[in-house]
């Protein structure tokens, strides 16, 4: 009962914030302000929606549209691209998600986008490539490349180290579990993730 009440309170608060943010989306506002408001609208809905709930599914479509508009109004708004990528990924649109993250990394290095790309390429390797194929290995190498890029941006970020550990472990199995050095590298990355760096 308490969880349900808290969820209802959260939804009421969300509605109030969304109403307030709609004031910032008007034509009298700058494109930058409108983009930021649309991004916040999309992100709030995406973060709080239950992806299995029918009513929330409609709200998620609205969130997707808001994020697309935000990215169109301000293509340099990295958060909008990343949030849109996560939303598309949850819907199973892996190519769309990859395009969103690539839009961010094409402009400048971005740790969050690189972390997302690392996870996404492992998902693509599993979903779109047969085990042990060159295609799968290529996707795994992309995952590893993006994880290493994220680490390079912040040596103390445990999440980046964790992604690198997962990429090495995936590579170990994708290559037939024959190279124990990959497993050792994976374990070292997990250790660095716990410590917050090497």
What are these regions (language model features)?
Residues 1-7:
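N-terminal alpha-helical scaffolding segments that mark the starts
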Residues 14-34, 52-53, 68-76, 103-113, ...:
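Flexible helix-coil transition and linker loops at the boundaries of alpha-helical arrays
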């Amino acid at each position: 009962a308490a969880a349900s009440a808290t969820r209802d309170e959260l939804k009421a608060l969300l509605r109030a914030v969304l109403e307030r943010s709609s004031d910032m989306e008007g034509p009298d506002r700058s494109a930058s302000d409108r983009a930021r408001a649309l991004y916040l609208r999309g992100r709030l809905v995406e973060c709080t929606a239950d992806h299995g709930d029918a009513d929330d599914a409609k709200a998620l479509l609205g969130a997707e549209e808001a994020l697309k508009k935000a990215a169109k109004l301000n293509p340099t708004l990295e958060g909008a691209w990343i949030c849109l990528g996560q939303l598309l990924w949850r819907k199973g649109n892996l190519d769309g998600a990859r395009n969103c993250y690539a839009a961010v990394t094409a402009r400048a290095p971005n740790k969050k986008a690189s972390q997302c790309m690392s996870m996404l390429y492992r998902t693509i390797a599993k979903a779109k490539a047969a085990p042990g194929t060159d295609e799968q290995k290529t996707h795994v190498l992309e995952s590893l490349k993006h994880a290493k890029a994220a680490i390079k941006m912040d040596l103390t970020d445990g999440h980046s180290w964790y992604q690198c550990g997962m990429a090495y472990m995936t590579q170990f199995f994708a290559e037939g579990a024959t190279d124990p050095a990959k497993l050792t590298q994976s374990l070292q990355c997990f250790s660095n993730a716990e410590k917050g760096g090497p």
